[in-house]
Every structure is written in structure tokens, then in C-alpha cells.
Amino acid sequence: MSVVKSIELVLPKDAVYLAGCIIEGQVVLTLNSTLVDPIVKVELVGRGYVEWNEETGASRDYSREVICNNKADYVHKTKTFPVEDNWLSAGSHTFDFHFNLPPRLPSTFTSKIGNIFYFVQASCMGREHILAKKKIYLMVQGTSSIFHSEKSLQNPLFVEAEKKVSYNCCSQGTICLQIQMEKNTFTPGERDIFTTEINNQTSKCIKTVIFALYAHVHYEGFTPNAERRSRVDSSELLRQEANTHITAFNTTKIVSTFHLPPVLSVSGSGSQDSEIMNTQYELVSTVHLPWTLTSVKAKVPIIITSNPVDSNQTAAGCRTRAPLPVSPDQQN
């Protein structure tokens, strides 16, 4: 029978930690029998990595795939708990701990190409080897180092896209698509409310309008020969489909709301994760025209920002609640 019955980490459930916050928790170690010379410790670790395959040499009549990758270490802190008289009796023992997150950290992130992850790990070691350990992954929201002026935060936005279309062999018309927003700068978890106006100057009916929020991630990596490479990958974060009935030569307005995820990478190269990746966001409204085999799209750049933690905030005050992340170990 093992000396250690269990080791557990006690942390606030479903918490999202802002960069610069304090992480408070407990390690609960339960022993079946007395343990001599134990080492009980807890670690806070934050890392990021990107990796993808890239074809090279196509212009030289040969091609081969090379692996491009990059990595970053964001935080690694360790606390070893003092043990009185260097032994622990059978039963449960509780150890309190806290860690200060650095003020500049990227947000938790996962994709097929890259991951940014954070975890707290508790362990108990005997004289020669690890007897037990426990790991919990954290959700961390990064903060912005580049702040946008009050004017850019408040100015309403208006975007218009117009397309002339041909249909039924010799018929022609125009579709005009407009998006209006009170602002285009948001924080994670906020509501994005926007109005779309569709002016249908054709003799056909428009039945479907699709709204989507995209993240365009620019990854930075290196080949085995230390040559810098980059790659851009886009993903759809949110999507809504409006089943409309916009009749011929008519105009319709649609008011939509997106509830942004509670954790998002902040926009642009001013973020801490910019050494391996940076993210841009875009809201796209699309009117599909199946009778012309084409579509009309209007695009609005979206800025995601997050203010640094106030020095007066308590540990509980700089946390929110969100679904737990999937660990990188579970994704592979």
C-alpha cells in the first residue's frame, strides 16, 4: 500500500484569472502512514508553443515538408512547504499557497497549430522519487499593453458593401449591405450589438443572412535551420444565421447580438504572446445569393482589449467564472 493516499488541489471552480492577479489555493495531502523526509511543493507554470508543417523547394523542382515551430515560457514559480521535524503523520495535511501572476501574460489559447496554457501542479516526493502529484489547468485572460483612445472606443462605425449581380440570363440588380455598430472595441465576455441593413434592388427574394466573428491568427516559427517562417490561420469563433424573407426591391434591418467568449487573446502585436502569435478579429455579415452563385460580404475589424489589474483589487476581485479549458494533454 502506498504511503500517500491522495493529493488534491483546492482552487476556485471555473475561475478566469486576469494577468497580474493573485492565485490562492490549498494543497491537501492525505497519508496512509507516516512519511519521513517529505518534500511537498506546488508549481505555477505557463508556456506557449506553435508547430506546423510547411512545404519548401517547390520552385526548385523538388519539394519536402519541414516542421516549423516556436515556443515561449511565460511563468514558472515554485513553493516548497516547510515540514516541521521533517515528518508527516498518517491523515490529512493542508498547505496554503498563493502565487502572483505576472502583469503581462497572454491569454489561454488553443488551436491545431498553437497552444498557450497555464497550470498549477502539486507534488509529494519521498527520499528518491515522486509519490503523488496533481495538476489543474487554469484559464488566464491576458491584458493589453496598447490602449486605444476614448475616441476610438466610442465612435460609431458604419461599413457598406455593394455588388451588382446578374441573374436569369439578362436581368441585373444591386445588393447593398450595411453594418452599423456603436463601437468596435470590446472586452472578453462583453456583448457586441450591431445592426445590418440589406437593400435588395433585384427581383429575387433573399432568404439567408449569416453573421460570423472570425479570429485571424498570425503564427511565428522557425525551421530546423533557424529560418524564420510565418503562417496565418483563420477560425470562426461565433456564428448566427438569420432566416429572412427580404422581398424584391425592399430593405430590411436586422439587429444581432454576439456574446463574446470569457477568454480571448487581446488584439494586435502589443500583446505578450506576439513573439509566437498575434490575433486580429473581424465581424463578417454575408448575404448568400444562390440564384447568382455569389454572395455579398461586409467586414468590420473588431478590437479585443483587457485592462490591467488595479493594484487595489483583491484576489477574488480579479476573477470571473467560465467553463474549464481542455488541457493540451487531452487534445492530442
UniProtKB/Swiss-Prot annotation:
Its main location: membrane. SMART domains: Arrestin_C. Residues 311-332 are annotated as: Disordered. Keywords: Differentiation, Membrane, Spermatogenesis. InterPro entries: Arrestin-like_C, Arrestin-like_N, Arrestin_C-like, Arrestin_domain-protein, Ig_E-set. It comes from the Eukaryota. It is found in: Membrane. GO terms for cellular component: cytoplasm; endosome; membrane; plasma membrane. GO terms for biological process: cell differentiation; protein transport; spermatogenesis. Signal peptide: none annotated. Plays an essential role in spermatogenesis. May be involved in the anchoring of the sperm head to the tail during spermatogenesis by affecting SEC22A-mediated SUN5 and NDC1 transport and localization. Belongs to the arrestin family. This is Arrestin domain-containing protein 5. The gene is ARRDC5.
